[in-house]
Design a protein with these regions (language model features):
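CN hydrolase (nitrilase-like) catalytic-core segments centered on the catalytic cysteine
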Residues: 60-83, 145, 151-195
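Short, acidic/polar
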Residues: 17-28, 156-161
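Active-site beta-loop-alpha junctions enriched in small/polar residues
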Residues: 9, 42, 87-89, 114-117, ...
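Generic structural signal for helix capping and beta-alpha/helix-loop junctions
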Residues: 14, 46, 92, 116-119, ...
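Short, glycine/charged-enriched secondary-structure capping and boundary segments
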Residues: 20-21, 51-54, 97-98, 162-164, ...
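Catalytic-core segment of enzymes that process non-peptidic bonds
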Residues: 58-148
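Short beta-strand segments enriched in small/hydrophobic residues
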Residues: 1-10
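Active-site beta-strand/loop signature of hydrolases that rely on acidic residues for catalysis
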Residues: 4, 26-55, 75, 82-83, ...
Length: 195
């Protein structure tokens, strides 16, 4: 049986502090036997898509890059398969919300670029991200074929269907969304029931 850990933590604007907390939590999960660890969507920072601010493009980086190299080393050190979610700067003016899957040896097993990009109040992702261009292809890892998608992709069942038809054994959706403290209790309940 595969032991899986999911990490969804509160973040701050301090990227290094977020990474330190993640490292602690990932290490704890690995020490408790997790072979597959999945991080939340855009885990390096606060969820910045609540505003349209050009300064937030400074958070993006290439893959491979500083963050992916860090998580590669961590996956290798802990001997885990690690699913991350990074703000990818692919080229000038071309940015993606990208899941990067690291194998137990630290190599990049594969990436998935989020295809369905929301543009709703507090979710201004179309300002930041270009839809993915890699299709729906499972990523082969030592723990199985992972159908990695990102957040809002779950509202479109065809993505999950295509992953399953292509042989995905597990569907994974790093996600940042949820209710906010100013949502009514009935709205929070409605959102929990849709998951």
């Amino acid at each position: 049986m595969l032991k899986v850990a999911l990490i969804q933590q509160s973040n701050s604007s301090d990227k290094e502090l977020n990474r330190k907390k993640l490292t602690y939590n990932i290490s704890k999960c690995a020490s408790e036997g997790a072979e597959l660890v999945v991080l939340q969507e855009l885990h390096e920072s606060l969820y910045f898509c609540q505003t349209e601010d050009l300064a937030n493009f400074d958070l993006a980086e290439p893959i491979p890059g500083k963050s992916s190299e860090y998580y590669s080393k961590l996956a290798r050190k802990l001997h885990i398969v690690l699913v991350t979610s990074l703000f990818e700067k692919r080229a000038v003016g071309l940015y993606h919300n990208t899941a990067v899957v690291f194998e137990k040896d630290g190599s990049i097993a594969g990436i998935y670029r989020k295809m369905h990009i929301p543009d709703d109040p507090n979710y201004y992702e179309k300002f930041y991200f270009t839809p993915g261009d890699l299709g729906f292809k499972p990523i082969q890892t030592s723990v199985g074929k992972l159908g990695v998608l990102v957040c809002w992709d779950q509202w479109y069942p065809e993505a999950a269907r295509l992953m399953a038809l292509a042989g995905a054994q597990i569907l994974i959706y790093p996600t940042a969304i949820g209710w906010t403290s100013n949502d009514t209790e009935s709205e929070q309940k409605r959102q929990r029931e849709q998951k």
